[in-house]
Curated annotation (Swiss-Prot):
Domain of life: Eukaryota
Protein name stated in the entry: Myosin-2A
Keyword entries, A-Z: Actin-binding, ATP-binding, Cell cycle, Coiled coil, Motor protein, Myosin, Nucleotide-binding, Protein transport, Repeat, Transport
Taxonomic lineage: Eukaryota, Fungi, Dikarya, Ascomycota, Saccharomycotina
Region (Non alpha-helical, tail domain): 1092-1567
Keyword Protein transport in record: yes
PROSITE patterns assigned: DILUTE, IQ, MYOSIN_MOTOR, SH3_LIKE
Length: 1567
């Protein structure tokens, strides 16, 4: 032990138990150490000692752990394992709202006295499901999960022992453990896909959970320490089958506090059930039971507080009634139970009259009569045995009177007997329901939950406290043996050297209680004596036990003869003997028992029979035990057959022995519940109270056992990653750089570290997988590491500062040299500059004078030259003007001469055209009359129509040719214009050259004439070229004008022809209307004849009204473009079948060839009527055998490539409706809808995204068609023709129901698909967003390559996988033409899901809450944000706010209150509870200071003040459905025609034939 100045330690305190201190002085004088301690309250304490290393010296303070370890999750990891360290760790965690702490194999649960629903939510259950203990923070769910997994994997029964004093939270803990098992079973059933099993198990689980409110109502009461205190012990076995599914349960109860029924101390209550029936029973029932209010009953008004704050007895009554019904208690039986309970209250009000020596009770006493009436017993006999007793001897029965006190005891005894019997009967009834013979045959394993009272000691301790402490002695002994066994097993498993660990054995105390001459045996012996009393029993105890060897654990008090003292494992307890004998007897008189057996209340009769059966089983158990003892002793002593009523003590002993046998046969887990204060105040921590409970519940004993061995255990990797710096780098650097690292390399490095740091090899042991350390070694290593790091930091700082200041010096030196050089250079440059300026001035003067003279001479010469050039220019211009005027005159003459004959020609041409027009008009009129005469013939009309159309086509072609020729002429014109521009540019060049030549003439007079002549020749030639071009341009312009006029004439003729055709059609419309009715009648008759043939063969005569009234209006076009019938003939049949009308129409029905149409209808009807083949082909071949087209960046899919299944279905459905096959269509659609949903349900793997999007697009297409059909039917009057109102309404109803069906299908497959996407995303998101470290250079320490090289396993995902996932969704939905609104909804839902599940996972991972992890998280989320921005979701970040703000929180400072306030402002999306959780779990790096405890307390206080129970949940709740269908908000697709496209790889012969037949309806008119 080291006590240098500055050492932190603990010093005893009367007020707080222990108080923190610091060594401020440590002097050694004359072999004595004089230490001065400064306590946290500034008090100074002096300590003197001879030896600082003597750990057993009580004067020495206890060493305190480093701050980073003070709030550890497992107390056994503390470096200094002592009482104050344990207490302080629990207190620190409690102040941070962490109520659970591990202490080795024990879970310590500190009652918060506050609602903590968020700790037990379904999200929390899922967080712990499948996790190993210690993987996430302590929780009772971790204990439950460990028990469940051990039972499942090791096939071994488990027990969870929940203990603690009243008010510590045992009942709540046991209840949530049961809920966890039920949830695990439900999850297990769901994973196995056994839906029926899940449904069945849910009922069993509900029944098991229903036992809680029943047991609480009949066995719990309000005490001074607890508002819901269990007044009995309970061991519940949850039974599992071979598949580890819950199939039932069994319950055992121990030592119900019967005296509470008749007596309650101040501020306490009776059992809850009495207050519940008074508050919840209907008024008429209460009148029948003669019930009023609690204050009117003696058994309920003694405590004085009939109500509990915050508890509604009416609602609790409803819960109890529901639970009773659930476990099989019939309503009639419930009424009988209430009668019994009411009778007990009335029994308590029976007034017994007191006489001098006796007591009396009239059979007419009102309360007695009511009680007997409710119990169904005789009031006279019942009253008799309240005031009398009967003693049975061998020869006679002696009846004597009871005094007043004895009569009260008799009255209360019968009440306690009835209530106890009722309680036991309820337990038996529950066991019968939850563990019937069918369940017994299936039991494979069980998990037992023991909810039992903790060690109790009060000012007055009676029989109940004695039994409770006896049970705790047995449990503590088993606990100590279990802890020792686990320690021993681990040492053996790791193959380390170990020595026997001594621990306090409480076997002497147990022997004192249960030996043949022990306390219980003497108590039973005294209880069987008629004159037995507490005083005589006490004397027997003193005489028998107050001597060796029992006097070590038994003693009598210094004063008085009414108590005895037992030295329990926790402390010595003095028991008051008053009432021991009476409570142990716990019997009712034989007279009362006979009266009760004669009851007319069937339920009470059943209860009494159950009591007798239980007593018989106890006697048989005792006989079996006695006979086995005789066999062991090998003495053939006869067993006396004496029938005795079992005492309460003997019954409790036997049940406790049975319980211990059960526990010893199972693997045990321990939960110790701690009550932090006596006032039940939320989040208040009383040091002394908690300390006493830690001592009593064996936690400190566990720690002492651990300290005696090797309490600290580190894996090799953890040890190296933490302490490798304690040896030189040359030792560990090669290991980290080694690629083929082995586990032996790791072990060797550990040995090197230990050899270099620890001299005493007894302080550690190296096992197979761990290193075991003695207590205090962890602090030793931390001190070495801190010293090493501090020296390294100093060294680094020294070198950094040295380099910095050297650099500064060198910079200053270089600066001085540079300054000198600059100064000298400046002086020299100034001198040189002056000389240069002098030289420049002289040179400027010289140059200026020369320039001035040259400028004057040049000006004179220039003036002369300009004068000469101007004169020459004027002469030349006059000559050019003369030539221009001459040429203009010639041009005017030629044009005038050409105008006169052209005008004459045009006049003649116009006259000729007029004549031709008149002749053509006369011919046209003649033809028109002929057409009118032949109009009566439909075939002639068709020919005329075709000729006119051909004429239109011919004229169109001519017009196109003319337009093409015009375009060529325009192109030629543009070329000529370009030539003119070129010529103009050439002329400009010549002009420029001419000017240059003129200037040259002034210097070269002699060559002027020749050059001028040459230029003139060139100019004349250029002018000729210009004239030629102009002439050609004029010719082309005239030709273009002529052709334009001709084109206009042809266009006019085309318009006239179209007008003529329109007039012809208008005139023929009258003829159409005349034959329309005949035509309709003919078509109807022929169709009927054809269908009559079919029905004759099938003996079915369906009603088929005309098809134009059956389907939505709007004729179908042969293709998307306008194609004439003649053109349609040349189209191949496959192409013609590609485009089909929505309703099956082809061209106008008036021109369909009747015979061909009849044949088509016959075959279509036959194919559609027999739906079995068609349904099977559509289901198996189309819907199940579909192929999804590839989607991606470079792939452009047409709509027909995507929705081909929908369009095929639409065609089939349309034809069914056209023929009136409504029943067949309903069957067909039902199978289609079911199959599509099944197909989507089975999607998985790489097919999930494309196939899901594919079916979303197809179902949307089908739904749009149905909406279109419904709208057409309801808005167009033509649909009512050919149908009566009944048929029309039936058709409307069919389409309306179909619309609803498709709405449901769209909703279902969207939900199924989205849930599957979430499930797929769940596997990837956490690894990719939370775990993966994509940002280089900021890898967290827990992801060190050392750990990954050896122990890395499992599938890993990165952000690239997540982005690929979202990219696949984007491209599939885009390629499949799914609306953007739907894509946006899907992505937003998935982003919210990623945000939720990643946050929920992150908040439970302690090691991931560091600033480096914050950087990595921020980087990963940023990549997701960028993807959203580039894919049309700029607001994607708002759906990832929790992750974004968590990343910010991890990177921000958190060391002051101002920092916390700033964090709260930035992280506005996080609740106070979430902020507190993240900050308290923040993983401090080696170079960071721990967050101060006062800051953590400040954050916790914010949660207490600002949060409500609804906002305390640290988890986000993912939106997992049901989801709203986003297609509801999107407009349906438009329908004009359906393109029937059947891919070549589909084998659908019947479907293809139907499509071909429908397509032939388009080509029939041209046949």
């Amino acid at each position: 032990m080291s006590f240098e100045v500055g050492t932190r330690c603990w010093y005893p305190s009367k007020e707080q138990g222990w108080i923190g201190a610091e060594v401020t002085k440590n002097d050694l004088k004359d072999g004595t150490y004089f230490m001065e301690l400064t306590l946290e309250d500034n008090e100074v304490v002096n300590v003197e000692t001879k030896d600082l290393t003597n750990e057993k010296d009580p004067s020495l303070p206890l060493l305190r752990n480093p701050p980073i370890l003070e709030s550890t999750e497992d107390l056994t990891t503390l470096s200094y394992l002592n009482e104050p360290a344990v207490l302080h760790a629990i207190k620190q965690r409690y102040s941070q709202l962490n109520i659970y702490t591990y202490s080795g194999i024990v879970l310590i649960a500190t009652n918060p006295f506050d609602r903590m629903d968020q700790l037990y939510s379904q999200d929390m259950i899922q967080a712990y499901s499948g996790k190993r203990r210690g993987e996430i923070e302590p929780h009772l769910f971790a204990i439950a999960e460990e028990a469940y997994r051990l039972m499942k994997n090791d096939k071994q029964n488990q027990t969870i022992v929940v203990s603690g004093e009243s008010g510590a939270g045992k009942t709540v803990s046991a209840k949530y453990i049961m809920r966890y098992f039920a949830s695990c079973d439900e999850e297990n059933s769901s994973n196995m896909g056994n839906l029926q099993h899940t449904a069945e198990m849910s009922e069993t689980e509900e029944r098991i959970l229903a036992t809680n409110p029943i047991m609480e109502a009949f066995g719990n009461a309000k005490t001074t320490r607890n508002d819901n205190s269990s007044r009995f012990g309970k061991y519940l076995e949850i039974l599992f089958d071979k598949e580890t599914a819950i199939i039932g349960a069994k319950m055992r109860t121990y030592l119900l506090e019967r005296s509470r029924l008749v007596y309650q101390p101040k501020t306490e209550r009776n059992y809850h059930i009495f207050y519940q029936i008074l508050a919840g029973l209907p008024e008429d029932v209460k009148q029948e039971l003669h019930l009023t209010k609690a204050d009117d009953y003696f058994y309920m008004n003694q405590g004085g507080e009939p109500e509990i704050a915050g508890i509604d007895d009416v609602s609790e009554y409803g819960i109890t009634i529901k639970a009773l019904t659930l476990v099989g208690v019939a309503p009639e039986t419930q009424q009988h139970i209430f009668k019994i309970l009411a009778a007990l209250l009335h029994i308590g009000n029976i007034e017994i009259k007191k006489t001098r020596n006796d007591s009396s009770l009239s059979s007419d006493e009102p309360n007695l009569k009511i009680a007997c009436e409710l119990l169904g017993v005789d009031p006279s006999n019942f009253a008799k045995w309240i005031t009398k007793k009967q003693i049975v001897t061998r020869s006679e029965k002696i009846v004597s009177n009871l005094n007043y006190s004895q009569a009260l005891v008799a009255r209360d005894s019968v009440a306690k007997f009835i209530y106890s019997a009722l309680f036991d009967w309820l337990v038996t009834n529950i066991n019968t329901v939850l563990c019937n013979p069918a369940v017994l045959d299936q039991i494979h394993s069980f998990i037992g939950v023991l909810d039992i009272y903790g060690f109790e000691h009060f000012e007055k301790n009676s029989f109940e406290q004695f039994c409770i402490n006896y049970a705790n002695e047995k449990l503590q002994q088993e606990f100590n043996q279990h802890v020792f066994k686990l320690e021993q097993e681990e040492y053996i498993k790791e193959e380390i050297e170990w020595s026997f660990i001594e621990f306090n054995d409480n076997q002497p105390c147990i022997d004192l209680i249960e030996n043949k001459l022990g306390i219980l045996s003497l108590l039973d012996e005294e209880s069987r004596l008629p004159a037995g009393s507490d005083e005589s029993w006490t004397q027997k105890l003193y005489q028998t036990l107050d001597k060796p060897p029992t006097n070590k654990v038994f003693s009598k008090p210094r004063f008085g003869q009414t108590k005895f003292v037992v030295s329990h494992y926790a402390l010595d307890v003095a028991y008051d003997v008053e009432g021991f004998i009476e409570k142990n007897r716990d019997t009712v008189s034989d007279g009362h028992l006979e009266v009760l057996k004669a009851t007319t209340n069937d339920t009470l009769s059943t209860i009494l029979e159950s009591v007798e059966e239980s007593a018989r089983k106890v006697e048989e158990a005792k006989k079996n035990a006695a006979s086995q003892d005789q066999k062991q002793l090998k003495k053939p002593t006869p067993i006396r057959q004496v029938q005795r009523k079992p005492t309460l003590g003997s019954m409790f002993k036997l049940s406790l022995i049975e319980l211990m046998q059960t526990i010893n046969s199972t693997n045990v887990h321990y939960i110790r519940c701690i009550k932090p204060n006596g006032e039940k105040e939320a989040w208040k921590f009383d040091n002394l109270m908690v300390l006493s409970q830690l001592r009593a519940c064996g936690v400190l004993e566990t720690i002492r056992i651990s300290c005696a061995g090797f309490p600290s255990r580190w894996t090799f990797n953890e040890f190296i990653l933490r302490y490798y710096i304690l040896i030189p780098p040359v030792e560990w650097a090669p290991i980290f750089q080694k690629n083929d690292l082995t586990e032996q390399d790791v072990i060797n490095l550990c040995k090197k570290i230990l050899a270099a740091t620890v001299q005493d090899k007894e302080k550690y042991q190296i096992g197979n997988t761990k290193i075991f350390f003695k207590a205090g070694m962890l602090a030793y290593f931390e001190k070495l590491r801190s010293t090493k790091m501090n020296s390294a930091i100093v060294l680094i700082q020294k070198h950094i500062r040295s380099k910095y200041y050297r650099k500064q010096y060198m910079l200053m030196k270089a600066s001085l040299s540079l300054l000198g050089a600059y100064s000298k250079g400046t002086v020299i440059r100034q001198r040189v500059e002056y000389e240069l300026e002098q030289h420049a001035a002289t040179l400027i003067q010289t140059m200026y004078r020369g320039y001035s003279k040259r400028s004057y001479i040049s000006g004179v010469i220039s003036s002369i030259v300009k004068l000469q050039s101007r004169i020459r220019e004027e002469l030349e211009q006059r000559e050019m003007q003369s030539k221009y005027e001459s040429n203009a005159a010639i041009s005017i003459q030629s044009r005038i001469r050409a105008f006169v004959p052209r005008k004459a020609y045009e006049s003649k041409r116009r006259d000729t055209i007029v004549v031709q027009s008149l002749i053509r008009r006369r011919i046209a009129q003649r033809d028109f009359k002929k057409l009118k005469a032949d109009a009566k013939s439909v075939h002639h009309l068709k020919e005329v129509s075709y000729k006119l159309e051909n004429k239109v086509i011919q004229l169109t072609q001519n017009l196109a040719a003319k337009v093409k020729e015009n375009r060529q002429l325009s192109k030629r014109l543009e070329e000529l214009q370009a030539t003119m521009v070129t010529v103009s540019e050439l002329q400009d060049q010549l002009e420029a050259q001419k000017m240059e030549n003129q200037k040259a003439l002034a210097d070269q007079k002699d060559g002027f004439v020749l050059d001028s002549k040459s230029l003139k020749d060139q100019l004349i030639k250029a002018n000729k070229d210009v004239e030629s071009v102009k002439f050609e341009l004029a010719t082309l312009t005239a030709k273009y004008t002529e052709m334009e006029a001709e084109s206009k004439n042809q266009l006019d003729e085309l318009e006239r022809t179209k007008t003529l055709l329109t007039e012809s059609k208008t005139q023929n419309s009258d003829l159409y209307s005349e034959i329309k009715s005949l035509k309709e009648e003919l078509a109807h008759l022929q169709t009927s004849i054809a269908l009559g043939t079919v029905t004759t063969n099938t003996n079915i005569v369906p009603h088929t009204p005309s098809r134009e009234n059956r389907m939505p209006s709007g004729h179908m076009r042969a293709a998307e473009e306008n194609i004439s019938p003649n053109q349609l003939k040349s189209i191949p049949s496959d192409t013609a079948a590609d485009h089909v009308s929505v309703n099956g129409y082809g061209m106008d029905d008036d021109i369909i060839n009747t015979n061909t149409l009849t044949q088509i209808n016959e075959e279509l009807y036959r194919l559609l009527e027999g739906t079995d083949v068609l349904n099977n082909e559509i289901t198996e071949g189309l819907l199940k055998g579909f192929q999804v087209p590839d989607a991606g960046v470079a792939i452009q899919l047409s709509r027909r490539d995507v929705v081909y299944p929908a369009r095929i279905l639409i065609i089939v459905l349309s034809e069914m409706w056209r023929f009136g096959l409504t029943k067949q269509s309903e069957s067909f659609l039902a199978q289609v809808l079911t199959t599509i949903q099944k197909v989507v349900t089975t999607l998985k793997g790489i097919d999930l995204i494309p196939s899901g999007a594919f079916w979303l697009a197809n179902v949307r297409e089908l739904y749009s068609f149905v909406v279109f059909a419904q709208h057409s039917i309801l808005t167009e009057e033509s649909f009512k023709k050919g149908m009566n109102d009944e048929e029309y309404n039936e058709y409307v109803s069919l389409v309306t129901e179909l619309k609803e069906d498709f709405e449901s299908l769209s909703y279902n497959i969207y939900n199924i698909w989205l849930k599957k996407l979430q499930k797929d995303l769940q596997k990837k998101a956490i690894n990719a967003v939370v775990v993966s470290e994509s940002l280089p250079g900021f890898n967290a320490s827990e992801s060190n390559g050392f750990l990954n090289k050896i122990f890395n396993s499992g599938e890993e995902y990165t952000m690239d996988d997540i982005l690929t996932f979202f990219n696949n969704i984007f491209w599939c939905m885009k390629s499949f033409h799914i609306e953007n609104e739907v894509f946006r909804t899907v992505i937003i839902t998935l982003l919210n899901y990623v945000d939720t599940i990643c946050f929920n996972d992150l908040i439970m991972k302690r090691n991931f809450l560091s600033w480096k992890r914050g950087l990595q998280l921020n980087y990963n989320v940023t990549r997701l944000e960028e993807w959203c921005k580039t894919h049309g979701l700029p607001d994607g970040a708002q759906y990832l706010q929790h992750l974004i703000q968590t990343a910010k929180l991890l990177q921000l400072r958190k060391y002051t209150i101002e920092d916390i306030d700033m964090v709260r402002g930035i992280c506005s999306s996080l609740s106070p509870a979430q902020l507190q959780k993240l900050i308290s779990q923040y993983h401090v790096a080696d170079y960071e200071s721990p967050i101060p405890q006062d800051i953590l307390k400040y954050v916790a206080d914010i949660v207490k003040k600002e949060s409500t129970s609804a906002h305390n949940d640290i988890f986000l709740h993912p939106e997992t459905g049901p989801f709203n269908d986003p297609f509801v908000a999107v407009k349906t697709r438009k329908f004009d025609q359906v393109e029937a496209y059947i891919p070549s790889w589909l084998v659908l012969p019947v479907t293809k034939r139907i499509v071909d037949l429908v397509a032939q309806q388009v080509t029939v008119p041209d046949a």
